[in-house]
């Protein structure tokens, strides 16, 4: 995803995201150390910063991190790192977040395992992502379309896969919900800077314009005190 599109989406979603995170993850005590894994340009980090002690954001995209650092408040810092191999010790964070990242990850099960590893016992892990279909043919078609639109796309995970990864790491699911979003394809193509030739190629397998996606929101707890 281009930096320009990422920043535009962050601006569009920021108010709703902050409200949703406060509802799903609060109340906060202002003492929490938070990890935003796959932070992009900092949407989750910036939403949580006023309510916690510290947020560390990690991403593999240097351009995203540069943009995030330019806007970061004093209690937020960013590091270049891979969500499947986090550069942190066991149980370092009170809250671990992974927002719209797993569909970009080749081995999402490793990412969830790392999220669980760095979370403190008794504390929360938050995952949100666009969901895939349980129908394998529909899922393949949607993944094909998403890869044309965003070369970093790997695979949309069905709800059951995400629940399975949480289960495999002995994480207790506290809450989950699914929301629906309308996506304006032409607006996304414009913001991403595609040429007209590229736009024609992407429009071909597009489900519709606008089209609807489902986003799953999961809050889990790591066992222990």
Per-region residue spans from a language model:
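Short alpha-helix
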Residues: 154-170
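Conserved class I S-adenosyl-L-methionine
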Residues: 1-38, 43-47, 63-67, 71, 126-148, ...
């Amino acid at each position: 995803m281009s930096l320009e599109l990422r920043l535009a989406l962050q601006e569009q979603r920021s108010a709703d995201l902050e409200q949703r995170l406060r509802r799903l993850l609060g109340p906060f005590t202002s003492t929490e150390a938070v990890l935003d894994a796959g932070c992009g340009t900092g949407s989750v980090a910036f939403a949580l910063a006023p309510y916690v002690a510290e947020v560390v954001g990690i991403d593999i995209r240097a351009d995203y991190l540069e943009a995030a650092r330019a806007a970061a408040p004093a209690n937020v810092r960013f590091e270049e790192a891979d969500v499947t191999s986090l550069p942190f010790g066991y149980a370092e964070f009170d809250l671990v977040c992974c927002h719209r990242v797993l569909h970009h990850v080749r081995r999402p099960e490793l990412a969830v395992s790392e999220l669980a590893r760095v979370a403190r016992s008794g504390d929360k892990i938050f995952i949100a992502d666009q969901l895939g279909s349980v129908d394998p043919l529909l899922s393949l078609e949607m993944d094909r379309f998403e890869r044309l639109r965003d070369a970093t796309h790997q695979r949309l995970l069905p709800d059951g896969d995400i629940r399975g990864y949480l289960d495999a790491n002995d994480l207790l699911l506290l809450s989950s919900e699914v929301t629906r979003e309308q996506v304006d394809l032409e607006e996304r193509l414009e913001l991403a800077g595609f040429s007209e030739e590229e736009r024609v190629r992407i429009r071909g397998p597009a489900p519709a314009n606008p089209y609807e996606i489902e986003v799953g929101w999961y809050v889990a707890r790591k066992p222990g005190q």
